[in-house]
Amino acid sequence: MVIILFIRRRLATNPLSTQMCIAGTISGSGDCLAQYLSHNQEWDRWRTARFSFLSSCFMAPSLFIWFRLLEKVKGNNKSLLLVKKLCIDQLCFSPCFNAAILFNLRLLQHQSAEKSWDLLKEDWFNIYATSLKVWPFVQVVNLCFVPLNYRVILNQVVAFFWNCYLSYITQKPIDHIEQFY
């Protein structure tokens, strides 16, 4: 209970930094679970660090800004407004966001921009298609019931499982990844 009160206070006073910390923690935990489920012999702490860094320094700030921009979309009919926001989110933001995540993740794996682009082209469609089976439902709940400062957190809670999937898909063996130690 003390942790929840602390988080609520932090969200009220410093929403972005709080969401960044929570996102990095949840994302790193999701990667740890993905590594465990894939029976990795040894925990790859740098892989977990990459996921945590990307989530806290790119994903959380992007979502923080995105949800505030999405709030500016207005309409008289609540149902139509929800559909409008959902379409903007899933058809405009989500494809670009997924592409940026995949590209940046590969760069953090020390891939060249060219190799990162090639891998993005290889993985993007399947990941985006799968995301359409998950995220529209999450966003309906988010947009209808969740206060603005908590939306990134709800996304990150669901992203715990989504990141397990992303981690599994994007961590397939790649020719010559240099380990960053």
Curated annotation (Swiss-Prot):
Transmembrane feature ranges: 20-37, 51-67, 86-103, 152-169
MF (Gene Ontology)? channel activity
Any idea where this protein resides?
Mitochondrion inner membrane
Q: What are its GO biological-process terms?
A: regulation of mitochondrial DNA metabolic process
Give the UniProt keywords, A-Z: Membrane, Mitochondrion, Mitochondrion inner membrane, Transmembrane, Transmembrane helix
The topology of this chain with respect to the membrane is: Multi-pass membrane protein
One Pfam family here? Mpv17_PMP22
A single GO CC term for this protein reads:
mitochondrial inner membrane
Q: What does this protein do?
A: Involved in mitochondria homeostasis.
Q: Which family does it belong to?
A: Belongs to the peroxisomal membrane protein PXMP2/4 family.
Entry protein name = Mitochondrial inner membrane protein Mpv17
Tell me the classification of the organism that encodes this protein. Eukaryota, Metazoa, Ecdysozoa, Nematoda, Chromadorea
